[in-house]
Amino acid sequence: MNCSESQRLQTLLNRLLLELHHRGNASGLGIGTGPSMGMGVVPDPFVGREATSAKGNDAYLYILLIMIFYACLAGGLILAYTRSRKLVEAKDEPPLACVAEQEWVPAAIASADPENGQGLLAEGGHQLAAGALPALAQGAERV
């Protein structure tokens, strides 16, 4: 069945509507005399004519509709999860303004004379010997 067969879909929806009105008891809907006995004769309340459908012939449509609903639900959840992960990863990275700010040289270092080392020591800086960098405590992370 393709989507262009609206008659079968209309029959299924009418049958579901009648079952709803009869509180789920549709056992009496197929009773009658004539060639359509046992074929699930469903009176069409909108047009006044009868549409025949074999019992259980349209059950796969209901299952298909439920499967499409759950597929859309799962797809939406996957997209929402992916979007939330991208937002978390974006928060982990420093903004470009902070990165650019860290690249600027402070004014005290820029005004220091690089040839004789004056300027930093005058402001209380410590001069390190070549190769004598302070050891960082193990496990210390930059936050």
UniProtKB/Swiss-Prot annotation:
Assembly information from the UniProt record: Interacts with KCNQ1; impairs KCNQ1 localization in lipid rafts and only conducts current upon strong and continued depolarization.
Gene behind this protein: Kcne5
Function summary: Potassium channel ancillary subunit that is essential for generation of some native K(+) currents by virtue of formation of heteromeric ion channel complex with voltage-gated potassium (Kv) channel pore-forming alpha subunits. Functions as an inhibitory beta-subunit of the repolarizing cardiac potassium ion channel KCNQ1.
Pfam families: ISK_Channel
PANTHER family attached to this UniProt entry: POTASSIUM VOLTAGE-GATED CHANNEL SUBFAMILY E MEMBER 1, 3 (PTHR15282), POTASSIUM VOLTAGE-GATED CHANNEL SUBFAMILY E REGULATORY BETA SUBUNIT 5 (PTHR15282:SF7)
Keyword Oxidoreductase: no
GO biological process, one term: ventricular cardiac muscle cell action potential
Family: Belongs to the potassium channel KCNE family.
Keyword Signal applies: no
Organism: Mus musculus
Glycosylation sites: N2, N25
Compartment(s) of residence: Membrane
Keywords: Glycoprotein, Membrane, Transmembrane, Transmembrane helix
GO CC terms: voltage-gated potassium channel complex
Lineage per the UniProt record: Eukaryota, Metazoa, Chordata, Craniata, Vertebrata
Disulfide bonds: none
Chief localisation class: membrane
InterPro entries hit by this protein: K_chnl_KCNE (IPR000369)
Cytoplasmic compartment residues: 82-143
GO molecular function annotation: potassium channel regulator activity; transmembrane transporter binding; voltage-gated potassium channel activity
Membrane spanning stretches: 61-81
Tissue spec. comment: Detected in embryonal dorsal root and nerve ganglia, in the somites and in myoepicardial layer of the developing heart wall. Detected at lower levels in the central nervous system (CNS) and in developing limb.
Membrane topology listed for this record: Single-pass type I membrane protein
Protein name per its UniProtKB record: Potassium voltage-gated channel subfamily E regulatory beta subunit 5
